[in-house]
Amino acid sequence: MTFTLYPAIDLKDGACVRLLRGEMDAATVFNTDPADQARAFHAMGFTHLHVVDLNGAFAGAPVNRAAVEGILKATPAPVQLGGGIRTRAQIDAWLEAGISRVILGTIALRDPELVKTAARALPGRIVVGIDAKDGMVAVEGWAETSDMKATELAKAFEGCGVAAIVATDIGRDGLKTGVNVPFTAELAHAVSIPVIASGGVRDVNDIRALKASGAPIAGSILGRALYDGDIVASEAIEAAG
């Protein structure tokens, strides 16, 4: 299985930021020009981008549209986008705007039929975002924890054309404490849908650990460690290959 790296651009108030454990008031601004950041990642050799509208995740509707459109104009790389996408109309609008894949998180738990219907109609374009704390699904921008296991939610989307699952351990996100390999591997073994690891990646050894897990893990999101310089792009790309 190909292992793809997705540098993350998290958008808050039009800027590229990183959060600690999903807390909006714990945001560090890394670039006030997200399009510039997208160009930089492309120049480093990354072939895909992972973009999150953080304001949108909390508002339940797209907020940073201008910043997203700037990213799309700045790079030829396929962009997957999440954050506040809760309706079929929003899905269609983003795909028409040039987004490669939309990530559906909260709505995957609240209205799984909407997600399944969209995935069947738009094969390869729908990604399910499963954010978990201690193995349980969290929703509404991580403000709430549900009583559903992450593996249970993942299995609900088998066979309907979902392109991938982005699995985030929110207890580790932004902390650089190391990716949760057992959690990601358990999910990857539980379903045939490609699973992408997210949350806590601290260095190139985490990429190697995901690849060496024996689970069919399809890739990893790279966040704070890439911005802080703890991950060198060329080394990460080599490890992923």
UniProtKB/Swiss-Prot annotation:
Q: Name the Pfam families for this protein.
A: His_biosynth
Q: Which GO terms describe its molecular function?
A: 1-(5-phosphoribosyl)-5-[(5-phosphoribosylamino)methylideneamino]imidazole-4-carboxamide isomerase activity
Instruction: Give GO cellular component annotations, separated by semicolons.
Output: cytoplasm
| Pathway note | Amino-acid biosynthesis; L-histidine biosynthesis; L-histidine from 5-phospho-alpha-D-ribose 1-diphosphate: step 4/9
Major place of residence:
cytoplasm
Provide the E.C. number(s) assigned to this enzyme. Answer: 5.3.1.16
- Places the protein is found: Cytoplasm
Write out the GO biological process terms: L-histidine biosynthetic process; L-tryptophan biosynthetic process
Q: Which transformation does this protein catalyse, written as a reaction?
A: 1-(5-phospho-beta-D-ribosyl)-5-[(5-phospho-beta-D-ribosylamino)methylideneamino]imidazole-4-carboxamide = 5-[(5-phospho-1-deoxy-D-ribulos-1-ylimino)methylamino]-1-(5-phospho-beta-D-ribosyl)imidazole-4-carboxamide
Q: Does the keyword rRNA processing apply?
A: no
Keywords annotated in UniProt: Amino-acid biosynthesis, Cytoplasm, Histidine biosynthesis, Isomerase
The residues responsible for catalysis, as annotated, are: 10, 131
What is the top EC class of this enzyme, as a single word? isomerase
Family of the protein in this entry: Belongs to the HisA/HisF family.
NCBIfam families on file? 1-(5-phosphoribosyl)-5-[(5-phosphoribosylamino)methylideneamino]imidazole-4-carboxamide isomerase
What name goes with this protein? 1-(5-phosphoribosyl)-5-[(5-phosphoribosylamino)methylideneamino] imidazole-4-carboxamide isomerase
Q: Which organism is it from?
A: Hyphomonas neptunium (strain ATCC 15444)
